[in-house]
Amino acid sequence: WGKAKIAVVLQRDHNVTISESTVGRIVSFLSGKGLISRARSRPQKRRRDFSKGHAQPWKYKDYNDMELGERVQIDHMTATKNGVTVKHFQAWERKSKHIHAQIYSHAKSTSAKKFLKELLQVAPYQIRSIQVDGGSEFMAEFEAECERLQLTLEVLPPSKPTYNGGVERANRTFREDFYDEPEIQADSIGALRFDLKNAVAKYNTYRPHFALNGKTPMEYIRINQA
């Protein structure tokens, strides 16, 4: 987490007041000792062909004109924990910052399809449209499932990962706070899924977000869907 969020949690949960600058110095010290690492950049995805199929190219739309559940960003990353390499799929909702994540043994379109179906079952908001990059995992069966569900599927232009910045930042958060966390001892996909479910719940119901005025994603959704 950033130094500002750490300071808020310390004050909120432990009644300990530490300045952001002090938190920053502690974080810098840990970084200098090699105890904090950054997420590695991923290789560029291949171009998407829009001549056939359900997907359509991404077009600019003002954030203020979007509704809850519109252009939900989905992405995947490769991660290794305790010798187990997994494909981590994640969805990020722009308005509430709500995320859902799941892991699979491969990053094929079948996995992306399974993830989409699971997301639709657990999301506490109506999913109106999906936004992805041009990766092959978001073609074939994934695209067909979006069409079957009548979900708009928008694909980013090549070399524009910043347009999926929300889910990219969420990926980095889970790489640092989950996969790089030494206290998590899970060493199988099943055990990692169990721990990941708990980590996702904590992110959505406990972690404060300054973009939400200190509220959690679930608090934001409850207020705005009331």
Language model features: what each stretch is:
Residues 1-69, 160, 221-224:
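Basic, flexible linker segments flanking DNA-binding modules
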Residues 11, 28, 32, 147, ...:
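Residue-level detection of the helix-turn-helix DNA-binding "recognition helix"
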Residues 68-100, 111:
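An active-site-proximal beta-strand-loop segment
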Residues 56, 61, 140, 149, ...:
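C-terminal domain-tail junction helix/linker
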Residues 97-102, 154-156, 180:
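Short small-residue beta-strand/loop micro-motif enriched in glycine and branched aliphatics
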Residues 129-134, 148-166, 182-187:
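RNase H-like polynucleotidyl transferase catalytic core
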Residues 84, 101-125, 129:
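Active-site beta-loop-alpha junctions of metal-dependent nucleic acid enzymes
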Residues 6, 23, 75, 91, ...:
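Mobile genetic element proteins and their domesticated derivatives, centered on retroelements
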